[in-house]
C-alpha cells in the first residue's frame, strides 16, 4: 500500500473558510436567497455549473476552469449543508462516503489486488465492485442500469451505447444489429 501524503494545511483552511461562508449565508441574518434554497432547488444549478466547468476545460481556460470548479464545489457543499438541516446527512458524511468508495474501488492501491499497470483491468475491477455494491443495496443490475434519465439526450444515448457494447451488443456494421432485431 502506498504511503498517503498529508493534505496541505492551506487547502484544509480554504475548505473550512468556504464552509464558514456557506453556514453564514444560511444562518439568520444571512442571505435571503441562500436561506430559501432546498436540495431540490439547488440541483439544477449544479447541472448548469458542471456544464460551465466542462466548457471551460474544453476551451483550455484553466483560470475559468478554476472559477467554475469553485462554483461547482460551493454548490455541492451548499446542497450537503442544506441536507444537514434534517435531511439525514451532512458535508462530512459526503466526504466520508466518497473516501470509503474510492478506497473500496481501488483494491490495487489499498489492497492486494494486482493489475500490473493495466488500465483495462482496473476498469473491469471497478465495474465488478460497483456491481457488487449495487447488488448489496438491492439496486437494479440490468445491463443498462446506472444511466441517469436526467442526462442530456446525446450524452444519454452515448452512455446507453457504451453499456450495450459492454453487454455484447456491438457490431462492426449494420447487418449485425439488423439480424439481432430480426432474431428478437
Question: What are these model-derived regions, one by one?
Answer:
Residues 1-68, 74-184:
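Flexible "arm" and connector segments at domain edges
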Amino acid at each position: 500500500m502506498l504511503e498517503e501524503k498529508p493534505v496541505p494545511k492551506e487547502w484544509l483552511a480554504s475548505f473550512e473558510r468556504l464552509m464558514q461562508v456557506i453556514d453564514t449565508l444560511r444562518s439568520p441574518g444571512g442571505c435571503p436567497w441562500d436561506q430559501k434554497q432546498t436540495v431540490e432547488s439547488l440541483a439544477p444549478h449544479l447541472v448548469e455549473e458542471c456544464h460551465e466547468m466542462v466548457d471551460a476545460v474544453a476551451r483550455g481556460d484553466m483560470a475559468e476552469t478554476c472559477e467554475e470548479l469553485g462554483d461547482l464545489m460551493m454548490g455541492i457543499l451548499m446542497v450537503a449543508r442544506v441536507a444537514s438541516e434534517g435531511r439525514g446527512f451532512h458535508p462530512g458524511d459526503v466526504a466520508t462516503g466518497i473516501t470509503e468508495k474510492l478506497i473500496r474501488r481501488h483494491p490495487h492501491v489499498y489492497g492486494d489486488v494486482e493489475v500490473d499497470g493495466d488500465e483495462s483491468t482496473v476498469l473491469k475491477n471497478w465495474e465488478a465492485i460497483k456491481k457488487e455494491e449495487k447488488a448489496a443495496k438491492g439496486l437494479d443490475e440490468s445491463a443498462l442500469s446506472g444511466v441517469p434519465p436526467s442526462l442530456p439526450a446525446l450524452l444519454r444515448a452515448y452512455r446507453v451505447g457504451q453499456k450495450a457494447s459492454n453487454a455484447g451488443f456491438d457490431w462492426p456494421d449494420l447487418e449485425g444489429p439488423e439480424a439481432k432485431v430480426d432474431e428478437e
